[in-house]
Amino acid sequence: MTDHGRTAIVMSRLPRLVDPHALWLRGLRAALRRIQEHGGTVVRIRQTAGSDFIQRGAERLGLPVDVIADGSSTAGNDASDTDIHTVRDRRVMSAADTVLVLGIRAQGNIHRALVEYLASGGRVELVDLPGLQPSTVRDELIRLGASTWPPSAEDQAPFNGTSDAPVQSHHSMSVYEIVPFPPPDQWVFLSHSTRACPGPWPHQSFCDYADSLLDELPDADHSASATLARIVAQRRVISSPQSNRGQHPVVCLTEVPLMELPLLRQYQVHRTRWDFEPFGVCVDRDWLQSRGARPVIYGDEATWLQLSDADRPYFQLCPAQVESSGDPGPKTDWRIEREWRHVGDLDLQHLPRDKGLVFVPTFEVAMRLAGISPWPLTLAPAPIDAI
C-alpha cells in the first residue's frame, strides 16, 4: 500500500443482525490498522455496505476520512436500488488509490465493480482471512491483478481488547433449576417472546453500538438469547411502538399457553423475521393485570374510531387484510395470538419468584441464564419447523 494513499474499504451487503465474531469485523479492524500504519486516508460513501462501521472505526483510530458524494443522481430517476448501489461502489473505488476488500458475494455488485476496477488498472488488496471471500471469486480477482494481504492476529484484535466475562447481577440463583412448565389447563401466565435486536439496543446510540462490536464487548451480541439475558439482568422489558397503531410504546404478551406457542410461530415477510421465538419470560396474569396490563381490543375501523385515547394503545385491527392489503401473501387473523399489552416499559424488579418463569430452547442457554435469573427456567417446546 502506498504511504499516505487514499484507501477505500469495500464489502458486500451485511446481514441485519451482526455477529460480533464475524470475519468481516476482524478484517475491518485489520484494514483500518493497515491504513493507520501507512498514514493513509479513508475514502467512503454514505449508504454503502459497512460505511457507518468504517467511519466509526476510523474515528477510533484517528484516521482522516474523506466522505465523497455518492453520485446516485447520475443513475437516473428510474434507476433501481441495484443501479444506485453499483454507481456508489464504482465511485468510491475510482476515488481511491487502493481498495481493500473484505467479504464479497459472487456476481454481486462489489464483485462486478472490482473486475471493472482491476481492468482499468486499479490497485486491489484482498484481506486474506479463510472464508472471507469465496475461493472462486478470490482466485478470479487474483488472476486479474489483485494482491492478498494476510493480517496478523494482532491486526484483527478488538480495539480495546476483549472481555469474556458474563453479564453479572446482584441477584442470582444459588441452584441451577429447570422446572416443567404448567399444562394448558393450569396456565396462569402471560408470555413475552424475545427476538434478536438488529442494530443498537433501545436508547443506545449507533456509536456505542459500533464500539461494542469493534471492541468485541459482551453486549455486542444482539441475538434473541442475548435480548432475553438483557431483560433478565435488567429486570425490565423495554416497550416499543413498533406494529402499534398510534405509535404507543407497549409491551406485547400472549395468554396462549407455552405448550401451544409453537403453533403461532410464522415468518413475517414484511419484517424479515420469525414471530414467537423460543426465548422469553412468562409473568403471572393477575400480577400483570394489577399493573395495568389489558387484553387487546380486536376490531375494525369503526371500532378504532369509537375508542377513547386511553383505550387506543390496546387496539389491534382485525381482520388483518384491512391493514395489509398491499401484502400478496396469506393474511393473519391476529385474534389467534390472544394478545395482552402493557403500556410503557414492564418493570420486573418486584416480580416474585413464584410469579415468573423464563423459557429457553436448550439446556446450554439455560445454564448461561441460571446465574442471573431470580426466576425458574423451563425448556420451551420446539418450534414446529424444527421438529
Question: Residues of each region from the PLM?
Answer:
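NAD-dependent ADP-ribosyltransferases
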Residues: 149-387
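Glycine-biased, small-residue-rich flexible motifs in mid-sequence functional cores and linkers
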Residues: 1-172
